Swiss-Prot record:
Keyword Heme in annotation: no
CDD domains in alphabetical order: AlgJ_like
Pathway it works in: Glycan biosynthesis; alginate biosynthesis
Protein name per its UniProtKB record: Probable alginate O-acetylase AlgJ
Residues at the catalytic site: D190, H192 (proton acceptor), S288 (nucleophile)
GO biological process: alginic acid biosynthetic process
Highest taxon, organism lineage: Bacteria
Encoding gene, per UniProt annotation: algJ
Length: 388
């Protein structure tokens, strides 16, 4: 009996291996290279090895299988995602501790204050949009994992830092929490917010900005059209390599409608001044929350402010690098806007940044200006406290 069982196991294994090997030949059949690819120096062999490795089914099977085991048995994905409850996924950047967080916060605080000083010298008003973490807004959908203590007061501490620096930064947490009753403000399987969440933030920013009086009366009216959308594969599912073999285990995709904001009507320049200023008065700088048109944050801001804007946000670069790039740009140097809106997710404050693409002396000057500004603010606060 044991001999028969062993033979069955051996035969099954050999048959499976043979079948997978034959299946893998399909990928080899599709291999092709340029006619002039040299053979003797090994480039042809390396090209075939790379192609075969990508097409080899056992590799894909192993990847899918281990991902399925981690996900179903342990509730885990690849580094980058935290599995929550109710089919929710979170970025692990909102949960894990950050190395050298305290020093990073100090350095980034100096840079933020240096940015404010640079803008102020050019008569540019800065308003920051500090975005609360998705995890802060949806703690009811946590799984077993909880955010590290670093994140507990990060949003409140960030707002205090910018307030001490004299930077306008309206509270966005409260309005987003209230807006949850009307719909999702963040996508379930994605790092990013929904167009609805972006609209809520745009409205709150406009409430802060309009009384400042920094924007000219344009009379422009913007309207947003909502178009049929469809399933949205969230970026956090990329850390769950379950498809194609175990795709049914993935959380169901979010449904994402398309939003398009356009100017409804144009107003003529005031009076008879044919040379009235046509410069766009607002610059938006930030991350993929602002850069990605699917969330329509730039459009929502245009509608809420009644003003056009130029979007300098970039995808995959964090909030600091696009801002530093903007300050170095000819657009800013030759024609600075009246207002800069800086979208800055809270989770980026304790992170370290590679600033090697910028001149080291300029970065040092920016930090020094920021630290000097902080010291002046601290001394002012101390003197005011002494008077009382």
């Amino acid at each position: 009996m044991n001999r028969t069982t062993n033979l069955v196991y051996a035969g099954t294994f050999a048959g499976t291996l043979l079948a997978l090997s034959l299946w893998s030949l399909k990928g080899a059949a599709g291999f092709s290279t340029a006619d002039n690819t040299p053979v003797l120096n090994g480039k042809l062999a390396l090209a075939f090895e790379k192609h075969y490795d990508e097409e080899f089914p056992i590799k894909k099977l192993g990847t899918n299988l281990w991902a399925a085991l981690d996900y179903t048995l342990f509730g885990e994905g690849r580094p980058g995602v935290v599995i929550g409850a109710n089919q929710w996924l979170f970025s692990d950047e909102e949960f894990k501790p950050t190395a050298a967080a305290s020093q990073n916060i100090t350095d980034n605080q100096a840079l933020i204050q240096g940015v404010r000083e640079t803008l102020a010298r050019n008569n540019v008003q800065l308003v920051m949009a500090i975005l609360p973490a998705k995890a802060r807004l949806y703690p009811e959908n946590f799984g077993e994992q909880q955010p590290a203590s670093l994140h507990e007061q990060l949003y409140q501490n960030f707002r205090r830092i910018v307030a001490d620096a004299g930077i306008q930064a309206p509270d966005l947490l409260g309005p987003l929490q209230q807006a949850k009753a009307g719909g999702q403000v963040f996508l379930r399987t994605d790092t990013h917010w929904t167009p609805y969440g972006a609209q809520v933030v745009a409205g709150q920013l406009a409430t802060t900005i309009k009384p400042i009086g920094v924007l000219p009366e344009s009379g422009n009216v913007y309207v947003t059209e909502t178009l049929p959308g469809g399933p949205h594969k969230g970026d956090l599912t990329n850390f769950l390599p379950l498809d194609p073999l175990f795709e049914e285990l993935l959380p169901p995709p979010d449904q994402l409608a398309k939003h398009n904001t356009r100017q409804q009507e144009e107003s003529a320049p005031a009076g008879d001044d044919l040379f009235a200023e046509t410069q766009v008065p607002v610059a938006l700088v930030g991350t993929s929350y602002s850069a990605d048109e699917r969330w329509n944050f730039a459009g929502a801001l245009r509608q809420a402010l009644g003003s056009d804007l130029v979007n300098f946000a970039e995808d995959g670069r964090g909030p600091l690098l696009p801002m530093l790039k903007f300050l170095q740009s000819e657009d800013f140097k030759k024609s600075p806007p009246r207002l800069v809106i800086w979208e800055f997710p809270e989770r980026y404050l304790p992170m370290a940044y590679d600033l090697s693409e910028f001149d080291a002396d300029w970065i040092a000057q920016l930090k020094a200006a920021g630290r000097q500004d902080k010291q002046l603010a601290d001394n002012t606060a101390t003197n005011q406290g002494a008077r009382h």
